Swiss-Prot record:
GO biological process: translation
Entry keyword Ribonucleoprotein: yes
CC per GO annotation: cytosolic small ribosomal subunit
Organism name: Theileria parva (East coast fever infection agent)
Subunit field text: Component of the small ribosomal subunit. Mature ribosomes consist of a small (40S) and a large (60S) subunit. The 40S subunit contains about 33 different proteins and 1 molecule of RNA (18S). The 60S subunit contains about 49 different proteins and 3 molecules of RNA (25S, 5.8S and 5S).
Origin organism lineage: Eukaryota, Sar, Alveolata, Apicomplexa, Aconoidasida
Compartments reported by the entry: Cytoplasm
Family per similarity comment: Belongs to the eukaryotic ribosomal protein eS1 family.
Keywords noted in UniProt: Cytoplasm, Ribonucleoprotein, Ribosomal protein
Any one GO molecular function term: structural constituent of ribosome
Protein name stated in the entry: Small ribosomal subunit protein eS1
Amino acid sequence: MAVGKNKRVSKGKKGAKKKVIDPFSRKEWYNLKAPVTFNVRNFGQTLVTKTVGTKLATDGLKGRVFEMSLADLNADEDQAYRKIKLSCEDVQGRNCLTDFHGTSVTRDKLCSLIRKNYSLIEAFADVKTLDGYNLRLFCVGYTKRRPGQLKSTCYVRTSKVRLIHKKMVSVMTNEASNSTLKELVKKVIPESIGKEIEKACKSIFPLQNVLVRKIKVLKKPKFDLTKLMESHNYSGDEEGRTLKVKESENATNLLTAELQSS
């Protein structure tokens, strides 16, 4: 027996329960703000670990990408087939200011457009907007039967597919290079670019259901807080204006009435 060792002293059990700490007690909620391009500005909340020492909570928020349905951002169920990606660029108080980071069409929508005996035509183009965003636009379209066509199939020749590819790329390049990112998003949401492609390709072969199925942000310009605040409508021009309320003819000044009565 070793000197100083007492067998009678009870030891702690190995399987003792540890103190349970709620993981959410170390986290806090931040509000997500969408740009003014969308109707719904507050589109959700996100969790982040609280600031501890030199590790700031804002560092864990910047760069986060959130994917939302366009139906929720615009309060329109008809736009549920399109998804929007928004990335957190800056944090103001408890609000995360986001910016456009891409868009895509749901698989259900693409599968619903595919038809038997019709040709599917795809194209993509790398473009640069006026405000310095490098984007890659993906377009998809389907052939359409000519008026009075008797043939059951509606396939297009490879030579015409090449011409349609060129038209798709040229239209997407012109629309994107002559507009800012905000203006481009406004064009993509109502599918105006797809309608322009249908008009341009009408002389080659009639198309239908042409849409920009995906936009990928390849490179963003240098971060500018002023432009971000403008996209969230924080400019000084939007301050409240004074309202002139016309006073009723029957209204009287109480002090004047008391002086007249005395």
